[in-house]
């Protein structure tokens, strides 16, 4: 584009913005003075979870109302989920009454999370009853995912409530109670006022605080104290007592995690903190952050099995960091006044990306990962991004911007479609930032100094302090002057080729490949029942032979294999994990092509892959020509 055209375009945009501003100003000036707002209502909510093993929850609400049309919302845009994921599809049995009379209601035609109720004269409150049906398995995640088994459940309050329109979520108050199955114990950051048998009553709080305070409960609960001031604890519910039967020393790294996080940030922004850790093979597996808790869920044996502990070592640190980065400091576009206003996800490279970097660093500093385990994880992240052809058409910024429209995208074709890459790619980018800060200050400062300024003192109870892109840039410049605006614009709009490896290289290491699988990859393959051949022939395939993904431009894709097909045989022998690994390694000394018999919608084809380089797996190799900065980054402080 020629400069004259650029100047004209900029002028046109500025002038258009001026006209919009002027029009808004004129419109606002004509408005009458707004009368004093009505006092915010208090809603009572009684949840009956005694049928949680059947995966159904019953709720009754009393909502203040006046004659006319009462508009109520089912929460839609959920914090931490970054999209319109409120599971309204699992809302059932909805009924509104007043003084014993059933009231007419209708769902809004333009928004399925909004309901309009006709309230008769002289009515001051409306009773609502509803059921929430928790999915029995499936691939749904977060509060839409499976959350109950025969022995446990995690209650996300947003799934069992409605709230009246006209106020922010911070203004509407809730008095909540919960009835649990007999004998079940519970844990939550929500203050309790009383308990009688299996019924618990909670302190009146804002809707914001209620939704931010899940309840974990079950027949088998183990509580591990991590720190006294402020109180922090690990609350573990599991499907069996055996899943909780680990020596107390296993929890030492979690105590050190709390200690190292305090040193990293220099302050906390919670009154107490609960790691709500669910161990079950029958709930959705994820982590979801809250101000004073995290809802983290993994398989039943993730605590008792050392190999699985390594595989899941990054989850709790990540969700814990979110208390500072995401809950306390939050992008302005995510700091919405209620759960209906659309969120803007453009700064997820900070919200999730920086959290991923800091969570991994804390996993190293706390001892949840050894230095080698940390490096193996970093190598796998880097190699995955280095084999991500979707970067050629879709930049990092769009992986954040597009989150609301990409919810529930399948794993097939993920390497070409791209997914939530602002997690992993920004581990590499924030490592790069950390090394630049160290270089610019001759090793005096690091990302720790940024965290102190941006998310640190003073201590406070839960609150939200929004930020913008400009504040990120300005705070980085406060720590270490540099062209941070240019750096981040380049990182967010870059298309490669290849992953951003400069942070690894600046820290004294190099990404290399050899035929040896790291324990991390071995554990990943065992847990997922998959073979990770992405770095050799560009194939991710289940032990059953089902092709999960292929990487464009690599041998499997070039030969014609695609996701959804099924490998039946390898070099004429039935497909198994051992057959596949052995045949792939044998290509290094064989002149013959690797032959895969593949089923595709009832048809069989033998694909011949012209590949002769054996198995390839990523590692980090020490670069002795540079200081070992990476080891210093993950060293306990």
Where on the chain are the PLM-derived regions?
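Early extracytoplasmic/domain-onset interaction patches
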Residues: 30-77, 158-159
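Compositionally biased, proline/threonine/alanine/serine-rich low-complexity intrinsically disordered stretches
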Residues: 25-38, 301, 632-637
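Non-catalytic architectural context of zinc metalloproteases
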Residues: 50, 62-64, 79, 84-93, ...
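N-terminal secretory signal peptides that target proteins for export/translocation
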Residues: 1-7
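Intrinsic-disorder/low-complexity, polar/charged segments enriched in Ser/Thr/Lys/Arg/Asp/Glu/Gln
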Residues: 42-44, 56-60, 69-71, 112-114, ...
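Juxtacatalytic substrate-recognition/specificity segment
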Residues: 61, 222-348, 354, 358
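C-terminal recognition in membrane/secretory proteostasis and scaffolding
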Residues: 359, 369-637
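Bacterial N-terminal signal peptides
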Residues: 10-22
């Amino acid at each position: 584009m020629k400069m004259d055209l650029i100047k004209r375009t900029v002028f046109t945009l500025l002038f258009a913005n001026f006209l919009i501003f002027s029009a808004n100003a004129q419109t606002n000036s004509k408005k009458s003075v707004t009368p004093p707002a009505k006092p915010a209502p208090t809603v009572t909510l009684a949840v009956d979870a005694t049928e949680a093993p059947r995966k159904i929850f019953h709720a009754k609400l009393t909502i203040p109302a006046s004659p006319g049309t009462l508009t109520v919302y089912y929460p839609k845009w959920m914090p931490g989920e970054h999209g319109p994921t409120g599971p309204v599809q699992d809302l059932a049995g909805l009924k509104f009454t007043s003084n014993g009379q059933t009231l007419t209601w209708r769902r809004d035609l333009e928004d399925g999370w909004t309901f309009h109720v006709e309230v008769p004269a002289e009515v001051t409150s409306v009773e609502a009853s509803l059921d929430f049906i928790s999915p029995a398995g499936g691939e749904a995640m977060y509060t839409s995912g499976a959350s109950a088994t025969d022995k446990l459940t995690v209650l996300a309050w947003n799934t069992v409530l409605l709230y009246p329109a006209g106020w922010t979520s911070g203004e509407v108050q809730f008095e909540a109670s919960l009835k649990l199955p007999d004998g079940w114990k519970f844990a939550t950051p929500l203050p309790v006022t009383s308990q009688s048998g299996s019924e618990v009553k909670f302190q009146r709080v804002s809707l914001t605080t209620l939704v931010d305070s899940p309840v974990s409960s079950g027949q088998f609960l183990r509580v591990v104290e991590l720190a006294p001031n402020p109180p922090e604890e690990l609350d573990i519910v599991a499907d069996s007592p055996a899943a909780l039967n680990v020596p107390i020393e296993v929890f030492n790294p979690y105590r050190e995690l709390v200690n190292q996080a305090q040193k990293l940030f220099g302050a906390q922004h919670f009154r107490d903190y609960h790691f709500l850790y669910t161990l079950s093979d029958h709930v959705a597996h994820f982590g979801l952050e809250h101000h004073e808790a995290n809802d983290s869920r993994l398989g039943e044996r993730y605590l008792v099995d050392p190999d699985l502990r390594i595989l899941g070592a990054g989850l709790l640190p990540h969700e814990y960091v979110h208390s500072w980065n995401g809950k306390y400091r939050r992008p302005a576009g995510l700091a919405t006044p209620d759960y209906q206003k659309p969120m803007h996800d453009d700064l997820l490279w900070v919200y999730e990306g920086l959290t991923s970097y800091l969570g991994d660093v804390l996993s190293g500093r706390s001892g949840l990962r050894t230095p080698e385990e940390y490096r193996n994880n970093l190598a796998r992240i880097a190699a995955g991004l280095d084999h991500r052809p979707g970067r050629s058409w879709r930049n990092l910024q769009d992986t954040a911007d597009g989150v609301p429209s990409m919810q529930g995208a399948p794993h097939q074709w993920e390497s070409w479609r791209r997914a939530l890459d602002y997690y992993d790619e920004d581990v590499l980018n924030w490592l790069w930032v950390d090394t630049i800060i160290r270089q610019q200050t001759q090793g005096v400062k690091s990302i720790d100094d940024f965290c102190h300024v941006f998310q640190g003192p003073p201590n406070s109870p839960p609150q939200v302090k929004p930020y913008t892109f400009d504040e990120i840039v300005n705070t980085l410049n406060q720590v270490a002057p540099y062209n941070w605006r240019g750096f981040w614009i380049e990182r967010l709009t870059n298309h490669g080729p290849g992953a951003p490896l400069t942070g690894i290289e600046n820290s004294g290491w190099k990404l290399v490949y050899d035929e040896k699988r790291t324990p991390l990859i071995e554990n990943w393959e065992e847990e997922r029942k998959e073979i990770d051949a992405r770095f050799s022939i560009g194939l991710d395939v289940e032990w059953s032979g089902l092709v999960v993904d292929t990487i464009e431009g690599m041998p499997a894709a070039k030969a014609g294999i695609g996701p959804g097909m099924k490998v039946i045989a390898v070099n004429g022998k039935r497909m198994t994990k051992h057959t596949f690994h052995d045949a792939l390694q044998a290509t290094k000394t064989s002149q013959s092509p690797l032959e895969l018999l593949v089923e595709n919608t009832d048809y069989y084809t033998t694909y011949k892959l012209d590949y002769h380089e054996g198995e390839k797996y990523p590692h980090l190799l020490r670069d002795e020509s540079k200081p070992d900065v990476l080891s210093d980054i993950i060293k306990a402080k």
